[in-house]
Amino acid sequence: MRDGTPRANRLWGRLLVEELLRCGVGLFCVAPGSRSTPLVAAIAEHPRARALVHYDERGTAFAALGYARATGRPAAWVTTSGTAVANGLPAVAEAATDCVPMLLLTADRPPELRHTGANQTIEQPGIFGGYARWSFDVPPPGPDQDPATVLTTVDQAVYRSQRPPAGPVHLNLMFREPFLPQPAQPDGLPDLWPGDGPYTRYARAAPVPDEAEVRELASALGAAERGVVVAGRLRSRKQGEAAARLAAALGWPLLPDICSQARLGARPEVSAPYHDLLLAGGRFPGGRAPDAVVRVGGVPVSKRLQRYVTGRKPATYAVVADHPFRSDPEHLATHRLEADVAELCAALAGRVRRAAAPGWLSGWLRASGEAGRRLEAALRERKGLSEPGVARLVSRLIPEDHALVAASSMPVRDLDTFADPEGPPVPVAANRGASGIDGTVATAAGFARGAGRPVTLLIGDLALLHDLNSLAMLRGLPAVVVVLNNDGGGIFHFLPVAEHGGIFEPYFGTPHGLGFRQAAEMFGLGYSGPRTAGELSLAYQRACAEGGPHLIEVVTDRRENLALHRELLRGAAG
């Protein structure tokens, strides 16, 4: 059997790659390794296979995640055996938590080498636990195996990664040595396909709520005088627009999260984009909490918004999402509807009657506009650069053809609170499923490739240090990295632990004393270090126009940042 092993490996690898391409997989994120040779060779030799090769498995996994965030389709993460596989867990956890499709193709030793002490062998089947939507341990290629089993396994994997709830799917692929035959013209593939598409065509599944449930919810919403529509994390501008139309039909304000695809380019006739500023003052338009809430999409970034909509249990609290998970940390939901978000919002908008209290919507819009004007005036009075000011400037100046990726921690929060709603309606992405700071640069690299757009990344210094080697994936991309370097963990200054001076700075503030000029030079990025808002505007616009990867470093002070946030929130709240 060993005489036929190299040819069987080559055939298996080529069948896998061909079928993945037929299923619409548009990117292979590859980390070099030996055991995955049959797969990698097939990717390299296929004229339609598009590959991103990077030397860090954690980075390539996050790049696959970013690609899927942009496209809604899975990329294939390809890795060798051993601890290389374990490096995918952070991205897998994020993808599973936020229902992002992902294909995990991990090479492994054959059965006779497991649990023997063989080199670079760990327990790979089941390694991703409950985060994998489906896992399959694929046996080694052999002459007695039907090649069609490869195709149907791939088809099932791609389908399971995208059907609700979307998420990671793991194919653990065993290969025996030798991995490839001697270099020669490869044999043609067997004639297994009836046409140009995949071997097995899966019809797309989409949950459809019961019509009676939709009517009942529409009736409950129509009876509420003071309601709000909260647009949480959404996957497309179409979904954000559908949420806005539902709010308009109800006569309620839309409170959009930065990742709702409705916060930038907000619709002024229905959107209250500065809701976080308003709620910071503890005063609500209309003087009371809502009696009905529709949350569309994921849990929003703003804790103040969450406290507002849940502080007094609403009579109706509906959660609409395209997955079956609970998504209700306060345990207040009265209605939970799983469906295509845009379609369900349209269905509700066509059935509700408008019973909003007079002045409810206009009060929200007026208060939000006033908060925005106070914020603008306060930031204009400041001469130096600040983290809120940088977030606002980027949201205003980002070109319409860009995408915006925000790191978790302070950047996504500052964009949520301070972004200019009149900025271009660009796609916005952040890893807010599990909300880790790891893999942010790699996510942006994958997102840019998936969206087919230049990308602007707003990131903090610790998140950039955490994923520094992923800057290599930005080579050749029109990418602008804006890093806010406050020499440590700025977000911890907003938490009660900041009062514990003896332990705070060494264990939470964690100053590092590092700058990023040399990192930009090492990875081939242009560099700017602006000190004023004017310099930042020029540097950012120049970097966007030049098109190559560029890093802009803005140095700030953590304590000053805390004081400024408090000042802006007090002032904008009125």
UniProtKB/Swiss-Prot annotation:
UniProt record similarity statement: Belongs to the TPP enzyme family. MenD subfamily.
The record's free-text note on cofactor binding: Binds 1 thiamine pyrophosphate per subunit.
Native source organism of the sequence: Rubrobacter xylanophilus (strain DSM 9941 / JCM 11954 / NBRC 16129 / PRD-1)
Protein name: 2-succinyl-5-enolpyruvyl-6-hydroxy-3-cyclohexene-1-carboxylate synthase
One Gene Ontology MF term: thiamine pyrophosphate binding
Protein's pathway: Quinol/quinone metabolism; 1,4-dihydroxy-2-naphthoate biosynthesis; 1,4-dihydroxy-2-naphthoate from chorismate: step 2/7; Quinol/quinone metabolism; menaquinone biosynthesis
Gene3D superfamilies assigned to the protein according to its UniProt record, in alphabetical order: 3.40.50.970, TPP-binding domain
Keywords annotated in UniProt: Magnesium, Manganese, Menaquinone biosynthesis, Metal-binding, Thiamine pyrophosphate, Transferase
Root EC class: transferase
Cofactor annotation: Mg(2+); Mn(2+); thiamine diphosphate
Organism lineage string: Bacteria, Bacillati, Actinomycetota, Rubrobacteria, Rubrobacterales
Catalytic activity: isochorismate + 2-oxoglutarate + H(+) = 5-enolpyruvoyl-6-hydroxy-2-succinyl-cyclohex-3-ene-1-carboxylate + CO2
Cross-referenced SUPFAM superfamilies: DHS-like NAD/FAD-binding domain (SSF52467), Thiamin diphosphate-binding fold (THDP-binding) (SSF52518)
Pfam families: TPP_enzyme_C, TPP_enzyme_M_2, TPP_enzyme_N
One GO biological process term: menaquinone biosynthetic process
Function: Catalyzes the thiamine diphosphate-dependent decarboxylation of 2-oxoglutarate and the subsequent addition of the resulting succinic semialdehyde-thiamine pyrophosphate anion to isochorismate to yield 2-succinyl-5-enolpyruvyl-6-hydroxy-3-cyclohexene-1-carboxylate (SEPHCHC).
Highest taxon of source: Bacteria
Record's subunit section: Homodimer.
EC numbers on record: 2.2.1.9
